[in-house]
């Protein structure tokens, strides 16, 4: 999805540099800035700006460089997810919908069908809940699927395309959302969701 958006921006004339790393940002008194960037070959170059909008997502460039990180007020949540070859996907519209099975106020299962026939499935819940299941990540995710009355039969026994990934305590926060010369947006500001 991000790649589709990036390509459309390039089509509309926006300059986007891929595989470049922001290594430093210096802000002046008036809010203007000088950003040091390293390209894919390690060459350093600089960009001067009146304002910076940080949409770096979970990379959280400005929060990291400006020491803006702070613990999240959101309770500790974790996730566990994988992709499967969705051999029992329903025909018609239902098989194309991104859906959630909310097990309780703190726990849900996502089901995200891809056009290639694979589906991303994953649980988000309190870390205590995620950690309550025993075994390796495959055994844990299979056990969790038993808690979904709606999706259990569809995904029971299907092989995972890769060993399920577990991400613990993924929520992040910042001390402030903006300052002189910059603003944080999206997941660089307050990261709530796991990668799926």
Task: Tell me the role of every PLM-derived stretch.
Residues 1-4:
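A conserved beta-strand/loop capping segment in the N-terminal third of enzymes
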Residues 7-155:
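Predominantly flavin-linked oxidoreductase catalytic cores and closely associated redox partners
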Residues 129-196:
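FAD/FMN-dependent oxidoreductases across multiple families
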